């Protein structure tokens, strides 16, 4: 089994209050918590976000610039469409297994204030390993030569 000693999450600094109060939540949970009506919420979860979105709660949801539909579509397997992939990813919280990947993401945030959250990987996986998923690729990037992705891209940590 893959051992992850330290895990990292890069959060928008404006979201720290929400994270302290509610924990790290997926985009799907953040939209529900913000009181976005279900029909609008479902549409938002399946739509590409070319820009960041600020919710009525003040929480900032990151853009999905590295996953434009035209670049993503040819990389999808299992009959998935770009809206299916966006919805799938919007149901998860993502952590990086190494600092280098985190720093690449930070550079992509183009100067917006960020906060680095550092987790004890062994403890986190002990407590949440049953629902943790791992991916062999950066599932949120479809630029350049995108890796194939499908229903088995996010794999159960226990089976990794």
Predicted regions and their residues:
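Gly/serine-rich nucleotide phosphate-binding loop at the start of the catalytic core
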Residues: 1-48
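Conserved NAD+-utilizing ADP-ribose enzyme module
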Residues: 1-3, 38-72, 77-93, 97-160
């Amino acid at each position: 089994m893959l051992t992850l000693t330290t895990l990292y999450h890069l959060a928008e600094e404006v979201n720290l209050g929400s994270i302290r109060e509610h924990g790290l939540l997926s985009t799907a949970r953040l939209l529900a918590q913000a009181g976005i009506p279900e029909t609008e919420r479902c549409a938002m979860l399946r739509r590409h976000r070319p820009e960041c979105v600020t919710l009525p709660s003040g929480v900032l949801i990151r853009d999905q610039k590295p996953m434009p539909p035209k670049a993503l579509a040819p990389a999808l397997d299992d009959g998935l469409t770009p809206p299916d992939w966006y919805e799938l990813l919007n149901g998860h919280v993502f952590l990086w297994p190494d600092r280098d990947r985190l720093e690449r993401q930070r550079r992509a945030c183009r100067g917006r204030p960020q906060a680095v959250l550092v987790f004890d990987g062994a403890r986190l996986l002990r407590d949440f390993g049953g629902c943790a998923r791992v991916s062999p690729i950066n599932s949120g990037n479809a630029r350049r030569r995108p890796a194939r992705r499908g229903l088995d891209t996010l794999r159960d940590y226990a089976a990794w």
